[in-house]
């Protein structure tokens, strides 16, 4: 299963996919003071609440506009899921060419 996490300035939204099917999703505050362990306990609780086990997660993707939250989330993925997440952000090569005068403004 794929765990996706999107960190916004106010809220973070996480979802779990089985193939193309969204199994469940959760919204929580983008708290900059949370540790990797706090994120890990929360994610484990949410998975359990949905009848899932962390061992079912095989891949993780994270996008974030809040850099201070990204580091503990990545540590959480490695510690609690033993998975190095794919971080979607600036510099990720996805095979698309941006033909804007200033692509950084997008």
Language-model features: locations:
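Conserved active-site "lid/cap" helical segment
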Residues: 42-58
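Residue-level preference for the first positions of well-ordered beta-strands
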Residues: 1-2, 59
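Short glycine-rich, Thr/Ser-proximal phosphate-binding strand/loop in the N-terminal lobe
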Residues: 2-45
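Short amphipathic alpha-helical segments, especially helix-boundary/capping motifs
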Residues: 17-21, 48-52, 90-93
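Short beta-strand-loop/turn "lid" adjacent to the catalytic site in phosphate-handling enzymes
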Residues: 53-106
């Amino acid at each position: 299963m794929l765990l996706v996490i999107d960190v916004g300035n106010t809220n973070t939204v996480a979802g779990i996919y089985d193939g193309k099917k969204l199994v469940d999703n959760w919204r929580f505050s983008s708290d900059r003071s949370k540790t990797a362990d706090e994120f890990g306990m929360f994610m484990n609780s949410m998975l359990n609440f949905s009848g899932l086990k962390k061992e079912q997660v095989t891949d993780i993707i994270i996008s974030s506009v809040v850099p201070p939250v990204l580091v503990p989330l990545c540590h959480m993925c490695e510690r609690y899921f033993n998975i190095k997440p794919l971080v979607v952000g600036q510099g990720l090569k996805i095979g698309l060419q941006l033909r804007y005068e200033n692509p950084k403004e997008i």
